From Swiss-Prot:
It comes from Brucella abortus (strain 2308). Gene3D superfamilies: 1.10.8.60, DNA helicase RuvA subunit, C-terminal domain, P-loop containing nucleotide triphosphate hydrolases. The lineage of its organism: Bacteria, Pseudomonadati, Pseudomonadota, Alphaproteobacteria, Hyphomicrobiales. GO terms for biological process: protein unfolding; proteolysis involved in protein catabolic process. HAMAP family: HslU. A double ring-shaped homohexamer of HslV is capped on each side by a ring-shaped HslU homohexamer. The assembly of the HslU/HslV complex is dependent on binding of ATP. ATPase subunit of a proteasome-like degradation complex; this subunit has chaperone activity. The binding of ATP and its subsequent hydrolysis by HslU are essential for unfolding of protein substrates subsequently hydrolyzed by HslV. HslU recognizes the N-terminal part of its protein substrates and unfolds these before they are guided to HslV for hydrolysis. ATP binds at I18, G60, V61, G62, K63, T64, E65, D247, E312, R384. This is ATP-dependent protease ATPase subunit HslU. Belongs to the ClpX chaperone family. HslU subfamily. Pfam families: AAA, AAA_2, ClpB_D2-small. Its main location: cytoplasm. InterPro entries: AAA+_ATPase (IPR003593), ATP-dep_Clp_protease_ClpX (IPR050052), ATPase_AAA_core (IPR003959), Clp_ATPase_C (IPR019489), HslU (IPR004491), P-loop_NTPase (IPR027417). One of its GO terms (molecular function) is ATP hydrolysis activity.
Amino acid sequence: MSNFSPREIVSELDRFIIGQKDAKRAVAIALRNRWRRQQLEGQMREEVMPKNILMIGPTGVGKTEISRRLAKLAGAPFVKVEATKFTEVGYVGRDVEQIIRDLVEIAITLVREKRREDVKAKAHLNAEERVLDALVGKTASPATRDSFRKKLRNGEMDDKEIEIEVSDSGASPNFEIPGMPGANIGVLNISDMLGKAMGGRTKTRKTTVKDSYPILINDESDKLLDQDQIVQEALRVSEDEGIVFIDEIDKIAAREGGSGAGVSREGVQRDLLPLVEGTTVATKYGPVKTDHILFITSGAFHVSKPSDLLPELQGRLPIRVELSALTREDFRRILTETEASLIKQYIALMETEEVKLEFSDDAIDALADIAVDLNATVENIGARRLQTVIEKVLDEISFTAPDKAGATFIIDAAYVKEKIGGLAKNTDLSRFIL
């Protein structure tokens, strides 16, 4: 797990997300608290519970983006789900315990990648031996092998085609048993056992020497790793460092005046309660305790209010953060300051066609103005409006770019207004086009 300080986490998030200081601070403190808890000993470590977060704010202001960037920073198992995808236990559909099962799968992948790095050097040597076997056969003399080894290391054999045998980890069928969530457990374990009993299946692949290395290194790494140890480590990492991000939580809040609990509304909230509070979920790798998993939830709360959530669930999301709507200045900064801003993306895309794009300052102002106006008059969809506007402005250039290699286009305010000004003024039209 990464040990960034809260200040470092916030400055890292600042590279990609404009504004929203409160939300960044809240997630930075929550992430740092995971690390602080790891430093504690014994009973106190068990007692410290994560403070779950509820992010409230209109669509397109950075709630989901904060969680995505946080996951990359954390170096911890992270799963993002939409609350609307789940139904109450006992009904057709996914139940919320599937979130934890997915988290464990992600943790196993993470741990395996880390362990593979540790044994990479030895795996590389073993892979080289297998490539030599494929090139000159196992019975070749040491002198022949050495001469081919030199050629291999010099890259002279990179394009030669060889046949290699690799273990076949063909995806085993994953059957859900109706009425028994998570009952695909049995099927997978049976196929695992059959694989072990038969000494593991292998399949032959044709590939070039250069392309065979990554495949063989992975294959050899897995032979050097203890799978049971990986699973045990992954279960521990899931329990201690796991982060679950639940988006669209406002969509499962009971609407005012609505009747009935609703299978995918209040029922899902009731199922989430024990998960957020701390329970034990059965997975095919073993039981996972959710006491120390950090839950970050977010919602726009356009129709419902946070107080429409079940009181018990509200109590389990003690940290509330409001994200503010974006201003004209925010839009300007999104276009110019973020590390992979839309403008930089379009310039890079056009460079592949040898077309040069240049945006003047007044063009950026015009784009920001139009985005703000449309959000105010049509529907507020936050920063996503910029994608719609820029796409419309650059439509002609994108279409004709292959025929204009070597050309330079300067986008200024006049060009923006020419392409989009009329549409933006006509509210009825812009409802459909922008």
